[in-house]
């Protein structure tokens, strides 16, 4: 309906391949049926287009989360070779093996029944307040115009928090 080309390249290792670039599959780092990943090689497709594909997936599934993610310096072929079957049969991209985290990593978490326009950060930003999203929060919460400080290193995240608190 949305005009995407969707195939299942390997019925023995079933996942969806969208427009020969984007993989839609289970998240193999969580319990069965909880999260779908929409993974992409960002040198071949803009993140905004991957996000549109992710939003299409989000509208059509009832899992808790759809995670849209991608990285640069990743080929479509390498991404496809990163698809694995877990011991319990779950099939998905092994994200660390896919190299999406290494360069130009972008991610957006799309929760079930959650609209960013009704979340506190967006409401605060619309009322003229400064909003800063630090660490993993900048991945999980979407707020247009927010200051973003990505990071997983605890020391850097704490420095960013203290810096932002000093500027409030």
At which residue positions do the language-model features occur?
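His/Asp/Glu-rich, glycine-adjacent segments
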Residues: 1-167
């Amino acid at each position: 309906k949305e005009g995407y080309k969707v195939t299942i390249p390997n019925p023995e290792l079933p996942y969806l391949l969208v427009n020969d670039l984007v993989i839609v599959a289970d998240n193999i780092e969580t319990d069965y049926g909880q999260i779908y990943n929409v993974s992409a090689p960002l040198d071949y497709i803009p993140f905004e287009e991957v996000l549109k594909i992710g939003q299409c997936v989000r509208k059509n599934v009832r899992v808790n989360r759809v995670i849209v993610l991608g990285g640069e310096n990743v080929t479509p072929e390498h991404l496809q070779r990163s698809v694995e079957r877990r011991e319990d049969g779950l099939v998905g991209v092994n994200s660390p093996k896919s190299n999406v985290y290494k360069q130009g990593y972008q991610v957006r978490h799309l929760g079930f029944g959650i609209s960013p326009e009704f979340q506190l950060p967006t409401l605060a930003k619309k009322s003229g307040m400064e909003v800063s999203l630090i660490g993993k929060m900048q991945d999980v919460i979407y707020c247009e115009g927010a200051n973003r400080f990505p990071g997983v290193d605890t020391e850097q995240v704490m420095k960013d928090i203290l810096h932002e608190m000093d500027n409030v």
